[in-house]
Amino acid sequence: MEVHNNTYTLTRCKFIVNPNGEILTNKNIVIQNGVIKDVGDEIEGDEVDCRKYIVLPGLVNAHTHSPMVVLRGYYDDAELNEWLSKMWEFERNMSKDLMKLGSEISILEMLSQGTTAFIDMYFNPEDVKELSEKYKIRAFAGYTFLDELFDAYEIDKLQRALRESEYFKPIVNVHSLYANSIKTILLAKQLAEERKTWIHIHVSETRKELYEIKRRTGLFPVEYMNSIGLLNENTQLVHLGWVASWEIELIKKANSKVTYCPTSNMKLATGGAFPLEDMIKNEITVTIGTDGAASNNSLDLFREMKNGVLLQRQMYWNTRVKALDLLRLATINGYKLIGIKGGKIKPNNVADLVLINSELVYPLYKERLISHIVYYITSEYVEKTIVNGVINDKKRLRDILREKVKRLYDKLNS
């Protein structure tokens, strides 16, 4: 981990890529106190030679379950409801130590892959807070309202004691409409309002869920959320594979945020079709997430961007969703969701950046870079990740990761 004194410069960056399609060549990025001060020809402070690097804004994993790396490969090749029952069965007896180790491994993995911020839904936000400060990654997490496993009032009490720190911010996690009573959902809503944060919830993931909520309430899931005042600018809706056109209008009107998890949805055979083009046309803030390592297996946002484009083309029989759209989801839209000035490399934005080794990318042409980033490059091409001006080298992170993975193996086989 390199922490430079106050000011340093990434010099002679081979390419600087922004999510509006702008690409700069052989320019410098001056960073001061964790913020981008200048992009151009200026040099201040220490110099970091970046002549071999493609520099991107940091990537935001807008939906994951960090401890579930422990369950990677545990129960694959099952549909969502069967898979969930197996996960909950394991999670009832999952030790706190194992949860924390799982979160630590996921954080090391994500940080080494270019993820600079992540939104976590699980049961150990205090661990995530501690680890985010230790490794310098932005984390947004909270205790999860889930009637199947926890008492809602106990979750409310725990959440109220959770405090913000430099790299961590509490959010309110609600597993889903179908896994919670209306009493629990309204308790979570009140909590989010009082704590001035947002609600992060799985919605309209499967046809079964849609039918169940319709049977229970007479409304489709997003309609129902709107009817109880749960649909607003502080709501993050995850999945939405089964959403009606009039519900998209409700999301737009409420200014709610949305998260697309293409790989997980395909793997769990949830069906439906996430209407990305319609969301973009309606100027809805759409972000992208890997989901957990138990349902995706990978936490690589480069893979996720590629799968995000390909799924749209397969489902809708057109190429109207472009590579650049997915880059926006992972960068500038992610930062809009978390409420931080970032996702674009420009003065006054946070210095959250990804450095890719251009020597591994070929044929290397400026006009092909956006295509390469989404369709060709994977996280293996990432060499450094910068968060809040702190430089993390992949090799160092991977050395720590190997040690933690050995501990995990020993725990699972003891």
Feature-to-residue mapping (PLM):
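His/Asp/Glu-enriched, well-ordered alpha-helical/loop segment
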Residues: S227-N234, L276-E359, I377
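Active-site gating loops and adjacent loop-to-helix segments of metal-dependent hydrolytic enzymes
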Residues: V70-L101, Y135-Y143, R207-N232, A254-K257, ...
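Histidine/acidic-residue-rich catalytic or RNA/ligand-binding cores of hydrolases
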Residues: R207-L219, E247-I251, A269-M279, N296-L311
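N-terminal metal-binding scaffold of metallo-dependent hydrolase/deaminase domains
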Residues: M1-E42
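Metal-coordinating catalytic core of metallo-dependent amide/deamination hydrolases
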Residues: D127-G241
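Alpha-helical scaffold segments that flank or form the walls of functional sites
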Residues: R72-I137, D156-S165, N413
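C-terminal cap of metal-dependent C-N hydrolases
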Residues: V350-R396
